[in-house]
UniProtKB/Swiss-Prot annotation:
Family, similarity comment: Belongs to the 'phage' integrase family. XerD-like subfamily.
Pfam family, one: Phage_int_SAM_1
Protein name: Tyrosine recombinase XerD-like
Organism: Streptococcus uberis (strain ATCC BAA-854 / 0140J)
GO BP annotation list: DNA transposition
CC terms in the record's Gene Ontology section: cytoplasm
Molecular function terms from GO: DNA binding; tyrosine-based site-specific recombinase activity
């Protein structure tokens, strides 16, 4: 299994210090699971991190989950393993007026899936649950449209040239935009991918919820009415949006 660590690290374009940190965390991970992957071993590894600070634990989760995804991608494992415990940092609620440096979201990244997830939330206000069910047949690259069917509501959204570029370049599945052997990835996978990207660009205090809040505030600032935004988000009622329009 050690050789797979080196192959994984060789596939990354990261600084020497980050490389050393990845290598240390992964060697420690293999030692603690006795070089044998199983759900039970992963649970034991997660418990071994309980004494660490939230930020240190979050870093190790990200590193190990990237490695586990790599093992699955190169067919070392016959199923997708992941650390499933959610790591929460101390609450640092981002105010509605938080100014994002948008350029960071569009720069080249080591986490293209996480980047696309972030952009689809920030630009279109989509939920991770909606992204997980998004089928390729619902994406029209020629007209730059995405159809989102939530069962009770259907919305058709136009997307930017930047998202078109990412969609065109991204390796996608055969059925879903984000796919694991023909099936949607888990919610934890979306959390991990988004978190890894946000950590990379220096916005690890953000979340899917705060990115969606930024979308809502930007729509309001563009002059989108409360009812128009309610429809755009596919909500049955504007109640949850009213607080943003009181700002």
């Amino acid at each position: 299994m050690i050789k797979h660590i080196e192959a994984f690290l060789a596939s990354k374009t990261i600084s020497e210090n980050t490389l050393k940190s990845y290598r240390y965390d992964l060697n420690q991970f293999l030692m603690l699971i006795d070089h044998k992957l199983s759900d039970e071993k992963l649970v034991l590894y997660q418990k071994s991190l309980n004494h660490l600070s939230a930020s240190a634990k979050k870093r190790k989760f990200s590193t190990v989950n990237q490695f586990l995804h790599y093992l699955y991608k190169v067919n070392v494992t016959d199923r997708f393993f992941e650390l499933s415990g959610k790591v929460s940092l101390p609450s640092t609620k981002v105010p509605f007026t938080y100014q994002l440096d948008d350029k960071r979201f569009y720069q080249k990244t080591q986490h293209p899936s996480g980047q696309l997830i972030a952009l689809l939330i920030l630009e279109l206000g989509l939920l991770p649950s909606e992204l997980s069910k998004l089928r390729l047949s619902e994406i029209d690259l020629d007209f730059q449209l995405i159809r989102v069917d939530n069962g009770s509501t259907v919305k058709v959204l136009s997307f930017s040239q930047a998202i078109l570029k990412h969609l065109s370049e991204m390796e996608v599945g055969s059925t879903y935009l984000f796919e694991n052997k023909g099936k949607p990835y888990s919610r934890q996978w979306f959390f991990n991918q988004l978190n890894a990207f946000l950590l990379e660009i220096g916005y690890d205090q953000l979340s899917a919820q705060s990115l969606r809040e930024q979308f809502i505030i930007r729509e309001k600032e563009k002059g989108t009415s409360l009812m128009e935004l309610t429809q755009k988000l596919g909500l049955k009622s504007p109640i949850t949006l009213e607080k943003y329009y009181r700002l």
